[in-house]
Amino acid sequence: MSFVVAAPEVVVAAASDLAGIGSAIGAANAAAAVPTMGVLAAGADEVSAAVADLFGAHAQAYQALSAQAALFHEQFVHAMTAGAGAYAGAEAADAAALDVLNGPFQALFGRPLIGDGANGAPGQPGGPGGLLYGNGGNGGNGGIGQPGGAGGDAGLIGNGGNGGIGGPGATGLAGGAGGVGGLLFGDGGNGGAGGLGTGPVGATGGIGGPGGAAVGLFGHGGAGGAGGLGKAGFAGGAGGTGGTGGLLYGNGGNGGNVPSGAADGGAGGDARLIGNGGDGGSVGAAPTGIGNGGNGGNGGWLYGDGGSGGSTLQGFSDGGTGGNAGMFGDGGNGGFSFFDGNGGDGGTGGTLIGNGGDGGNSVQTDGFLRGHGGDGGNAVGLIGNGGAGGAGSAGTGVFAPGGGSGGNGGNGALLVGNGGAGGSGGPTQIPSVAVPVTGAGGTGGNGGTAGLIGNGGNGGAAGVSGDGTPGTGGNGGYAQLIGDGGDGGPGDSGGPGGSGGTGGTLAGQNGSPGG
């Protein structure tokens, strides 16, 4: 590590550049001296002579000023060069003194008092940072058949080292865990990515390493490592979990993603007192298997939003659930599901003030009774609105698929808050030669209930039907004391609309039924 602010080699290089600039300017001044100082008169008259003398006087004044500037420039370059030498000497002296100080601590505890830990050899852990100050070393990347090395831990102040990447193998090797941050200040290190699966059978990717925790008062948790890639036709490895944030302040780390699907994304790390939860890891697509999005981490106990749930492109897999907020904050949104899976539910809002997170959408389904939108999160405190329900999936397959139902809206807070709107039901496709019979449009989600003061959420609209049973709209949420009931969602093609929610008992109107 550098023991002074200045970098001597940079200062020396700058001084050399300045010297070169000075030489170029000096050469240009010398070349201009003769023609400018010896200007001939245009004629023999007195006016021409006076003009020539004026130009010559200006040239002489310029040359005198240039000489002074060149002297200052030379002195400045000498000062920079001398300063660089002084910095280098001071750094060498400090390093020597620090080596003497670190020696006993290294011998007794296996780590210096001040200084960064060494990076690990292939597959080996990084060295710990100094007891007083210093970052942990990075774990070494794994070779063939080797897991990634864990990142080194920090001491009192410093960041944990990053975990190494897992090595390739018949089954990919795990990535190394991120090191923990300093006991006072410092972030956790990121987990290493999982290794590549290369074997002929069961060649799945390695799991990502977990992110390091910020165990001190201040710091962010490290991100989980990405899952490794599987061989063609095989699943990837699961994503690593995110690390927790610092005791007083810090966000949880994000969960690791899964690029090739068929394994779950990593869960986001939790915050502790103040901070946001980490987002859950997202999942790519693979030919077979299940791969759900990671759940979002919870927000800080005092203040912080929940992390968003991870999304998934993998078939028959669900989006991750959003994390819950603490005392103040909003719940995280649920992740979406792309094919034959349900959207993730939204997280709950703060226990005092905060909104529920929105439910995740479901994009399409092949008719396997899945593909529902996630429910909106409830506002569980005194003030806050419920989250909106996610939209149901569109029916696109050949098994008489119906659209997925929309998610229900979350309830409003106990005192003041509106109910969340229900998600719309998914549509079905138009009958064709390939798909002669289609299912019903998805049912709209119900609107959420309001708090003592607030409006009920509107019901979701039914999905458009092909030749199946017309879809039904969702019911509107009801108000409690003061507020209007939510409107019912409209049905499709003559299908029943949802009922309107009742208005408040003290003041408010009933919601309109869906058409």
UniProtKB/Swiss-Prot annotation:
GO (cellular component) term, any one: plasma membrane
Compartments it resides in: Cell membrane
Disulfide bonds, paired cysteine numbers: none
Pfam families associated with the record: PE (PF00934), PGRS (PF21526)
Keywords assigned by UniProt, alphabetized: Cell membrane, Membrane, Transmembrane, Transmembrane helix
Signal peptide: none
Protein name according to UniProt: Uncharacterized PE-PGRS family protein PE_PGRS34
